Regions:
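Bacterial N-terminal signal peptides that target proteins for export
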Residues: 1-6
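Bacterial N-terminal signal peptides
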Residues: 7-14
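Sec/Tat signal peptide C-region and signal peptidase I cleavage site
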Residues: 15-21
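Sequence context surrounding c-type heme c attachment/ligation sites in exported
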Residues: 21-151
Length: 151
């Protein structure tokens, strides 16, 4: 009976760890997609001239981006490295866990950049500067910590 209880406990603990890993991966993938779709996409298109400038819409996108970025830091716990063959277009590089302080600093820098950009998108030129700054932050992290799995 004792061995059975230990075996069941070990199985449940293992299943819980796998579920937690999967949950973190799914949450961060969903948030990253939402950051583009609901956050920076409209301001980015406006800055490129692909959409008419709308200050309220630009600010709403930046606010959404800030909301999403605030949720990101805890979504890379030690047990949430991506599987060997992820079924998503992009995944997190294992370099994140090799250099967690740098990764966390990049997230903090993005948070700061978003906060500093608020209210600066008063016209297209201001929005272009905001998008340029945010893009540099995003690229700085994605170049090092994002893996493209399939095209």
């Amino acid at each position: 009976m004792y061995r059975t209880t230990l075996a069941v406990t070990a199985i449940v603990a293992g299943m819980t760890a796998v579920a937690a890993q999967s949950d973190a991966i799914q949450k961060r993938n969903a948030l990253m997609k939402s950051m583009w779709k609901d956050g920076i996409s409209a301001p980015y298109r406006m800055a490129q001239g692909k959409e008419p400038f709308d200050q309220a819409k630009a600010e709403a996108g930046l606010a959404k981006m800030a909301e999403i970025v605030a949720q990101l830091p805890p979504l890379w716990p030690p047990n949430s490295k991506p599987p060997a063959n992820p079924d998503t277009k992009y995944s997190s590089s294992t370099k994140i866990w090799d250099n967690k302080p740098d990764f966390e600093a990049k997230l903090a820098n993005l948070t700061k950049s978003i906060a500093e950009s608020r209210g600066k998108a008063k016209d297209v030129d201001g929005l272009k500067e905001v998008v340029r700054s945010l893009n540099q932050n995003c690229e700085g992290c994605h170049e090092r910590y994002q893996v493209t799995n399939r095209k």
